[in-house]
Amino acid sequence: MNDRNADLEAVINEYSDMLYKICFVILKNEHDTKDVLQDTFMIYYTKRPDFESEEHKKAWLIRVSQNKCKEFLRFHKRHAAVPLEKIDETELITDGLNEYERETLSMIWDMNLKLKSVVVLHYIVGYSVDETADILKISSSAVKKRLQRAREALKSEYKGGLVYEK
């Protein structure tokens, strides 16, 4: 196996789970998520970018995968197809979650992409506010504001009918 193939295999092993979670939350579909991940790794393989650090590589992969998700959503919005059957693929990612966690995840999926991106990177993947800002190429204050708006949206959803107390 040559060095490029070994590098690609190492990148896939290292980052595929994290990128899958990010893309699945955006696309809400296992098959589309896998397509976007394949495109992301092909871009990595063909461009062979140089990175200053592993964090830079990770941020680049997240950025490319998010851009591919946006591109995918734009394309399918313009070229809407009628699904043959509606399959609830959320079961794949929500297996093992309690009802409150499933409802919260469902509400996150329904957020606009700007809010959803910061919520996924900060709360699900675990990046700090500054790291999230670097990845999304926005200011830290913009990340904080979007997180605040996302929390407010979740609170208002819970007040609108869902009641949960720990």
Predicted regions and their residues:
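Sigma70-family region 2
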Residues: 2, 28, 39-56, 76
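C-terminal edge and immediately downstream basic/flexible tail or linker adjoining helix-turn-helix-like DNA-binding
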Residues: 1-9, 80-85, 134-137, 151-166
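A short, charge-rich alpha-helical start-of-domain segment used by transcription regulators
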Residues: 1-21, 34
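Residues within the DNA-recognition helix of helix-turn-helix
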Residues: 15, 36, 146-149, 153
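Arg/Lys-rich amphipathic alpha helix in sigma70-family domain 2
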Residues: 63-82, 149
